[in-house]
Amino acid sequence: MRYLYTIFIFSYSFLFALPPLKDAEIDSFIIARYSGDTSMVNQTIASGFLYVHTPYVGLGVSAYYVDGSLLITDVVNDSIQTFLSVGDKIHEHNGKVVDKSGINTNGAVGEEQKLIVTKAGDSTFSELTIPLQLYQYEQDSASFVEEILKYSDLWFDFDVTIKEKVIRKNKVFVHYLWEGSKYESGDTYYFSAMEILYLNKKRDLVERIEGIWSEKQFRDQFK
């Protein structure tokens, strides 16, 4: 993967001196996450690191399209295990046969979704009615690094613009814009992210990252 990055920073420190983890190192850490530089990432995150994703409304599962159905590969919250489990297959969603584009679960918390599924190891079709819930997915360091590698493999090149960064004690608020292309001279895709990085007591490692609710998560609840 090739990458370029542009940094326009309005940085404010409320300390008399910069923390051990310098501004440039924080920038490099963000770039490393998207370039697939797992060595840099591993050097920057602390033992027991957690990445807390932006909250979203949905079914709380990850699924991939395989042979005409969506195979569930991960369940975010144990409470949904009463409905869906890893290995189950979704065949229909709200009366429509699923396809490789996945399913659109836009709606408010509590809105019911009707699914036709087969349970893992069973060929019997069942109809389930599952309400949408608010979920917040957490990743440990191993899962975080694995996801970095998968994501970097998807893109031919990318660019990160850090719009604003605020440092206060052991917290770093950062707002950045990502854009990238999957192919040379291909279409460009964009997203904007706001995150809080929590540093350890020495302020030289990142212990936790929290995604912040955005307008997109709010708008996605509407049909």
Task: Annotate each language-model stretch with its function.
Residues 80-100:
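Conserved PDZ fold ligand-binding element
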Residues 138, 146, 150, 208-223:
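Low-complexity, intrinsically disordered terminal/linker segments enriched in charged
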Residues 65, 126-185:
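Surface-exposed, charged secondary-structure patches
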Residues 18-74, 103-106:
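PDZ/PDZ-like peptide-tail recognition elements
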